[in-house]
Amino acid sequence: ASCTERKHDCTKDRHSCCRG
């Protein structure tokens, strides 16, 4: 997942920049 993807996709891939 990248930072442009939906937060639930980012969080499961541990993208902290999306978790905010």
Curated annotation (Swiss-Prot):
What are the alphabetically sorted keywords of the record?
Secreted, Toxin
Any one GO molecular-function label of the UniProt entry: toxin activity
**Coiled-coil features, chain-numbered ranges:** none
Top-rank taxon of the source lineage equals: Eukaryota
How is expression of this protein distributed across tissues?
Expressed by the venom gland.
What is any one of the record's Gene Ontology cellular component terms? extracellular region
Tell me where in or outside the cell this protein is found: Secreted
Q: In which broad location class does this protein mainly occur, judging by the first location in its UniProt entry?
A: secreted
Biological function: Spider venom toxin that exhibits cytolytic activity by forming an alpha-helix across the membrane. Lethal to insect larvae.
What family does this belong to? Belongs to the spider toxin CSTX family.
**What is the name of this protein?**
Toxin CpTx-4a
The taxonomic lineage of its organism, from the top, reads:
Eukaryota, Metazoa, Ecdysozoa, Arthropoda, Chelicerata
